């Protein structure tokens, strides 16, 4: 910008002051109700896989790094990663590479205190397990498997499933589900992580089986205060069998959770408000985070949800459905 010298000119001085004033990033509160727009399906499973599902996504160096579960025609589970890509429109052309180990329902994040990447998942050598790496884009660069959690839950046909891990300044927390109307939590000192949460846990939410089913995710809300400092989403099964997400909020990761957008008619994300036309199910996924670290921070001004959906004309066993990725963007 060019400035003209004008003695005593308040206009030129004002412009100069404005030019030197840094812009302040606006902070948004979580909405009380949600309305989204949706992409179409963003990628198709490569040959040999029938579904891409259970997504975890981080943005590092301006690119999305996505890990996911896969299923085949027999309903067997595996896992994969996409080649890193910068825009959602590039996901269809990104490479799809099977992991050399099964990392089903994965959670990927950068553990900042020890400068290491962590990939947590289920159905390994313990109830939940993890591996570490210096480069999450190198599928062959992960460490040997270590125990993340060794506990067992009762009243569940699946045992503990669909973990997520998040940290605050002092502790790391493990949240998980069991397809049984309960959400569970375990914790440990952040100084002891990466490591095992052991076998102890507590039930933090309890209700009808279909209302608290699976796919729990927990996030720090950027700029959040009081009871909306943390956001939890949980996958539910609706009255007609379609999957949707309910949301809960809390003032601390170790505290109590309060229902926010928690009905099928007014969900966090579902058929009622997704804007999606290619799927009637909004299922297991991950909100796009501000940064890749253990705080799992999301920006309520720019919420996006990477989710799994499927053609409404497809039916049958859940594990045989042709799940594909899509992205919801919150309408402002």
From Swiss-Prot:
Its main location: secreted. It is an enzyme of class 3 (hydrolase). GO terms for cellular component: extracellular region. Glycans are attached at residue 313. GO terms for molecular function: alpha-L-arabinofuranosidase activity. Gene3D superfamilies: Glycosyl hydrolase domain, family 43. Residues 1-26 form the signal peptide. It comes from the Eukaryota. It catalyses: Hydrolysis of terminal non-reducing alpha-L-arabinofuranoside residues in alpha-L-arabinosides. InterPro entries: GH62_arabinosidase (IPR005193), Glyco_hydro_beta-prop_sf (IPR023296). CDD domains: GH62. It is found in: Secreted. Transmembrane segments: none annotated. Its EC number is 3.2.1.55. Disulfide bonds: none annotated. GO terms for biological process: L-arabinose metabolic process; xylan catabolic process. It holds the Pfam family Glyco_hydro_62. Keywords: Carbohydrate metabolism, Glycoprotein, Glycosidase, Hydrolase, Polysaccharide degradation, Secreted, Signal, Xylan degradation. Coiled coil: none annotated. PANTHER family: ALPHA-L-ARABINOFURANOSIDASE AXHA-2-RELATED (PTHR40631:SF1). Alpha-L-arabinofuranosidase involved in the hydrolysis of xylan, a major structural heterogeneous polysaccharide found in plant biomass representing the second most abundant polysaccharide in the biosphere, after cellulose. Releases L-arabinose from arabinoxylan. Belongs to the glycosyl hydrolase 62 family. This is Probable alpha-L-arabinofuranosidase axhA. It comes from Aspergillus tubingensis.
